[in-house]
Amino acid sequence: IVNTANDHVVVGTGCDGAVYRAAGYDELLNYRREYIGFVEEGGAFITPGFGLNARYIIHAVSPRFIDGDHGEEEKLRSCYRKSLQLANENGVRSIAFPLISTGGFGYPKEEGLRIAVDEINAFLFESEMDIFLVVFDEKSTRLGEKIYPDLEAYIDLHYVEVANETEYLPDGFGVAQTGRSRNFED
């Protein structure tokens, strides 16, 4: 699987927090501290899957969207490229990506989806792998269905509602382990 990671050794909310909890929070965090450390936005690194039913976790260091004029697109493209390269180098036959940076880091969902599909298609033109793009929220699902009518949706919306209630505070803000808060509006 691919996880959306922070550049510093901290655990965020959303996908990052869910992956750490499922894989084994302390074990994964200690591994990152000991063997990985700081990674620039747009970079990627690989860890064992630990408690997950996955051989590896590929962590894509997600760019924060500012205004589109600070290299965000190239950093986001780099996340997909480097993640796919790591997967290929490690013999991965199938991989699941979240829609990187389109949650708490504020990347516009439509643009993020276009970039994901572009980079995945470019990779598949040269290599063979089963690639799944997993969208979590209803807005991203609707957007995907609009742009790609044959999109296969497989998310229990009740699960999404429960996860949102437990993951994020009622005022719409999520708090990462760093103590920083981020707005999670659509």
Annotated model-derived regions:
Residues 1-186:
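Macrodomain-like recognition of ADP-ribose-binding/processing modules
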